[in-house]
Amino acid sequence: MNNIIVERLSLLREVMRREKLSAFIFPSTDAHNGEYVPDHWKSREWVSGFNGSAGTVVVTQNEAALWTDSRYFIAAEEQLQGTGIVLMKLKMPGTPTIPEWLGRKLVCIDSPEVGVDGMVNSINTVEALRFELRRQGGITLRTNFDPLRDIWTDRPAIPQNPVEIHPVEYAGVDTAEKLVQIRKSLARQHADGMLVSSLDDIAWILNLRGSDVHCNPVFVSYLLIGPVTATLYINKVKLQNGVEEYLCKHGINIDDYQNVKSGVKKYEGFSLLLDPEETSYSVFKAVGNVDVVCQTSPVPYMKAVKNDAEIKGYRSAMLKDGIAMVKFLKWLKPAVEAGGQTEMSVDRKLTALRAEQPLFRDISFDTIAGYADHGAIVHYEATPETDRELEPHGLLLLDSGAQYQDGTTDITRTIALGPVSEEEKHVYTLVLKGHIQIELCKFLKGAAGTQIDVLAREAMWRDGMNYLHGTGHGVGSYLNVHEGPHQIRMEWKSTPFVEGMTVTDEPGLYLAGRFGVRIENTLVVEKYKETEFGEFLKFDSLTLCPIDTVPIDKSMLLQEEIDWLNDYHARVYRELAPHLNDEEKVWLKDATLPI
């Protein structure tokens, strides 16, 4: 594989020489600035061989480098071996920014020009990059060229999978009402309309789902919302089984996907909101004389606050997922003791058990099944080359989820496959303490995730330990497993929590070369109480699955943490047991015994 990457870099550099480009930058994003992208837009992976969900590759005539975050440090080092591409560890001391690195590498070149594909870079990304490159000795930026157009000869086509209607019984609110609320918000933002580029936003607005992106039920399109009408830019072949009639009934015009730039130009004389974080720079440059309002889209926030039907759907999906998880956990240890089970085989087993549940559609992301030292690779994905046989000792980190038609799930359990060391118990209990403190949290309405994040880390910090990923992210309703704008993380995020938001609680600790621990539930924000000091909120766990008590050092837990765990396990048994057979009930009863 790495010889292929060297050949691809050579072809790329020939194109760059012909175009007089000193460097080219490949991000992870697509034309819709999504986190997960169709294969057609996986340019960075094609160039570098690195398949993580986040990262940027920069190629000059003589060097190349990949910038990625702590989730992928270990995986990136392995995947980049032999390619000549250097790993740049984001947010680590001594790591230069991309403009700083380019400033050093291009210092001896007269009038250096750096290229990016404006279709897969947002307005904000391009403008910020242009500003920073100017500061590095006047490096200019070209945005109208895709260097892989002629050399990526087997490039996958843009997917054309059919779209399906998402019933309002699961969506809770119909498309007409959503458009009314969006237009009201646009009026407050002094805009007559907006272009929606984000695929999960479009799916949510229209109550449609697709399968164009692996594990994410979305479809490639743009949605242009005007003062009265709206137009969906999509390949018509995707509109089958009454979907075109459904759109017409809701007043949605249909045009070809490739016509979005000309469609935007028709709004001359109107003000059009373009979210600078989501809208492609090339689309922005095509608007002509349209009055552009560069502001944050109102849709992600609307989508993040779940209605009663969506929350009901989550609870139903989590029940089904909990049943599948219990069946899996009951099977796991005897299967490992019998021999022959690997990281990939347990992934297949869990997916098969989920697929038996009603309304199952897909997994919600590629399962992370990391045994022993593989558990320390935050976003590890087993391959035939790395797949490891499980042994009846040590820890298995299992991060997985499913797409059910009534909800999306995301759960992590770290499981003792047999005897564990005192160090493993200590680290496991630190992570559990952080997880429970988020679950127990009561907070003033208006608080954001940044103000809550420390609760997950405080016990770890006392031990001089930390993790570098976020503590929690929003979860879609039969949509993307990662959703915003709210998060729980150290870095400042100003979006406050409100009732109806879902968020994960997933602290972890990772000891490179040894083992990793992460424990994750999905939570929903609920009202706690109102006093003379204001309104207070709390979290309620949607996830129903036992947390392994074998690796716990009980002496490290506070009484309130013990009480929470015992209460949670009593609830897990109470809600799941009626749906299990007698053997499964016996196993679950034992797994949820008070500690």
Each language-model region and where it sits:
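Active-site neighborhoods and metal-handling regions in enzymes and metal-associated proteins
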Residues: 1-595
